[in-house]
Amino acid sequence: MARLAAFDMDGTLLMPDHHLGRETIATLSRLRERDITLTFATGRHVLEMRHILGTLSLDAYLITGNGTRIHSLEGDVLHRQDLDPQVADTVMHHAWDTRASMHVFNDNGWFTGQEIPALLQAHVYSGFRYQVIDIKSIPAHQVTKICFCGDHDDLIRLRIQLNEALEERAHLCFSAVDCLEVLPLGGNKGSALAVLSNHLGLSLADCMAFGDAMNDREMLGSVGRGLIMGNAMPQLIAALPHLSVIGHCGNQAVSHFLTHWLDNPHLPYSPE
């Protein structure tokens, strides 16, 4: 039986309205009652995740910024990884040929260059929001990650530009169809989960994980049991064809799977 369960948030644990369902919350509590350690592994900021965690009355480790930070149950930093300052400087100051908006994250929050109210819809549960600022004024040595939000085809073209400019100095991945992330080299949820597992005296074989996007690829592919959401990016399903695909986040599929796993661990699972 798994001893550590890792959950992506958007498109996985959260429903399409960006809230946690009642069944999901109840199932997470059942896992804790079985002494299974929880960690939320997300691209969201730790400041936002602390607020969400506080509303749940659950003990959980936090892997945030797509693996750039790990926080303990008490809120202490267990692991931190920032973008190479030269990479951050290049990304923030270059005039990219794109219509996508740029978003910069550091320990102080989420920063962008203009008001984009539509992006706040994903954060209605917590009330977390961006700060509008001159991006070029942000110190490059304090950047955890940078992401671009926009049309997928535009982001694919931007990824080519970024790869040419950054070469092998950063990790690029899609955390959603409309979001391209620039992360520290070697920084991802999978490597962070390996650090956390080691801290807990566990191996990745002792973990199960759930996700839906390409920023979950390393995590899902490295654990003892990786589960892909039915609403996942097709690229993720294609990249990890050996993993089981469960139901849709809108149907609280993680809760559905875990309820079966807790109650009938020896019976085959069907998402229907």
From Swiss-Prot:
Its cofactor is Mg(2+). It is an enzyme of class 3 (hydrolase). The active site is at 8 (nucleophile). It catalyses: 4-amino-2-methyl-5-(diphosphooxymethyl)pyrimidine + H2O = 4-amino-2-methyl-5-(phosphooxymethyl)pyrimidine + phosphate + H(+). GO terms for molecular function: 4-amino-5-hydroxymethyl-2-methylpyrimidine diphosphatase activity; magnesium ion binding; phosphatase activity. Mg(2+) binds at residues 8, 10, 212. Keywords: Hydrolase, Magnesium, Metal-binding. InterPro entries: Cof, HAD-like_sf, HAD-SF_hydro_IIB, HAD_sf, HMP-PP_phosphatase. Its EC number is 3.6.1.-. Disulfide bonds: none annotated. Catalyzes the hydrolysis of 4-amino-2-methyl-5-hydroxymethylpyrimidine pyrophosphate (HMP-PP) to 4-amino-2-methyl-5-hydroxymethylpyrimidine phosphate (HMP-P). Belongs to the HAD-like hydrolase superfamily. Cof family. HAMAP family: HMP_PP_phosphat. This is HMP-PP phosphatase. The gene is cof.
